[in-house]
Swiss-Prot record:
GO CC, alphabetical: periplasmic space
Originating species: Pseudomonas aeruginosa
Family assignment from sequence similarity: Belongs to the NosD family.
Keywords noted in UniProt: Periplasm, Signal
Signal peptide range in chain numbering: 1-23
Keyword Signal set for record: yes
Predominant localisation class: periplasm
Summary of subunit composition and partner proteins: The complex may be composed of an ATP-binding protein (NosF), a transmembrane protein (NosY) and a solute-binding protein (NosD).
Reported function: Required for the assembly of the copper chromophores of nitrous oxide reductase. Could be part of the ABC transporter complex NosDFY.
Name of this chain's protein: Probable ABC transporter binding protein NosD
Localization per record: Periplasm
Length: 109
């Protein structure tokens, strides 16, 4: 026999808070970038979950199979610097709330 109980309010609040923590923006430097020259970086293949901010000039190239995304809310990449180029990246599961300015790539510079 399976019994269902109501989720206590404190657990619901903790779950909501955990979701907002997971959606926090991280510096692009938290990814395993490989140097390819001055201000040139390669993101190797893999799945990278979260929102990442680029706050300095750089050329970011993603290897085949490199995917990033914020798991359904927010923007995958937030660009806050000039002289930034992004090439070959697959951006998945970014938010759909245009009022919150969600986008695959949000250019704030």
């Amino acid at each position: 026999m399976i019994r269902y109980t109501k989720l206590p309010a404190t657990c619901a609040v903790l779950l909501l808070a955990a979701g907002s923590v997971m959606a926090q923006v991280q510096p692009i430097s938290t990814l395993p970038l490989q140097a390819q020259g001055e201000n040139r970086w390669l993101l190797p293949a893999g799945e990278y979950h979260g929102q990442f901010v680029i706050d300095q000039p750089m050329q970011l190239r993603c290897a085949a199979g490199a995917c990033c995304g914020p798991t359904g809310q927010g923007s995958a990449l937030i660009i806050e610097a000039s002289d930034v180029s992004v090439e070959g990246c697959t951006l998945l599961n970014w938010g759909r709330d245009l009022t919150a300015m969600d986008a695959g790539v949000h250019i704030a510079a």
